Amino acid sequence: MTVSRIATAGLALLLAAACTVPTPPRGQAGTAAGMVCAPPPGPPGPETATTIDVIEQAYFCILGNYYSAATLDARQLLAAGFIALTQELNRNGRDVPEATMPALTGDRKADWAAFEAVYRKTTDQVPGLRDKLAVVTLEAMVAALDDNHASWAHDIKRNPGYYDGDGEGLGLQTNVTGSQATGNPGVAVPPLFVTTVQGGAVKAAGLRPGDVIESVNGSAPFIDGKPTSAIAALYPQYPEARPVKLRLLRQSTGRRWSVTLKPGLYQRDLAALQVVQSKLMDDTAYVRVRGFAPDSATRALRAISRLRTGRTLNGVVLDLRGNGGGSPTEAARLLSAFVHGKDTHYLCTADSRCESVRTDDTVELLGLPLVVLTDRGCASACEHFGSAVKDLRIGRLVGTRTAGLMAGPTQPYLLSNNTMLGFPSRHGLGANREEINRIGVAPDHHVPSTPQDAAAGRDPALAKALTLLHK
């Protein structure tokens, strides 16, 4: 999964959850009838072929709505698209004399006209490749934004045997998440080890939390402390079906062995599908929020209220590890149970015109101490929450630095072939107007997990949080 595919997954989650984000400024509208893009009114219809007209619509959609469109050099998008086109020709053993990049002047409309003319001349000579060339061209143009919240969702296939709640893949999680391995590898640190056995081939092979993965398909996951592309093979997505060979070490016994795992569907633990889980830990309310889906803040607050009934709590531990984000509105609502009258986040244009996301002061204050657990899987709206907790001194963060994937809330746009383009209309900053994207939010107490912790079922970050609340 590339950065684009990670963003695509986020876009799909956004659409499935009907998450609303601020309406973007129109800026420059599309240049022709039918070229204006708009948020989808509902689920898209059947997907049709990607054509040069769809690429044109996406090009002007970006220039009219992307948060930095006013300062964006559109020639970079066209150049990236043309590079991808010529590379795809080469991969298919073809080339076309007319496939030469036209001179671009910086006039967005004129440059598009020049690009389109050459594109049509090129693709007309290879009609059998027309669909492939269109797809790679648009993919490259979106990727040229270099934005972890920009994506183009298309050709999404689902395993025909899939049922709601099924897991798919090898059936494991490691200390390097799928998003880190494929789109944010710089944040990964060795060793690579199993943290959760979810089911599927991994469970059948007898792997356990704490097992160290020494190689993936014969390649080391880290070289000189830096992650390699081999880790991505742990997270195949349908229709990827090639077996994955792992070399493993169980440190408690010294055993080394190899297994070959085949991706597939598997039944997941129903508890793992719950967005909000809670339990009482002595006199502390522990609440895990896996994502900021609609109504997640209300569910979390109801859980705390239930745990508080008939007893005095000494505080709240909010576990946001692995929370991939969701609605910034939900994040702000949950924050509002701990502080009122504050700016929690800023959404800005490229010229630094910003609007704040305020606390919802209709939410009743809990009046309880707060500790938040974070890790590199805490992304987007989760980082909005974590940065506000730290900046506004609402509580303390324990664990590891967050993902650094907070470009801004994704706004979806429906293209004419029923595919979905998504990108931020405004850029996100923390409560102190600091940059979080690509950097993440540092914890107040750095408590990483180890293979030994995973093997023994220990949670050192949670233990630290409970200790802090009991001081």
Positions of PLM-derived features:
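Bacterial N-terminal signal peptides that target proteins for export
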Residues: 1-10
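C-terminal motif of bacterial Sec signal peptides marking the signal peptidase cleavage site
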Residues: 16-18
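Bacterial signal peptide processing site
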Residues: 20-22
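N-terminal low-complexity, Pro/Thr/Ser-rich intrinsically disordered segments
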Residues: 26-53
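Cleft-lining beta-strand/loop regions that shape enzyme active-site pockets
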Residues: 47, 51, 125, 195-196, ...
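Extended, small/polar residue-biased N-terminal targeting/export presequences
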Residues: 52, 67-186, 243-245, 251-273
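Sec-exported extracytoplasmic/periplasmic mature domains
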Residues: 59-68, 82-94, 116-127, 137-150, ...
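PDZ/PDZ-like domain segments forming the peptide/carboxylate-binding groove
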Residues: 104-108, 165-215, 219-223, 294, ...
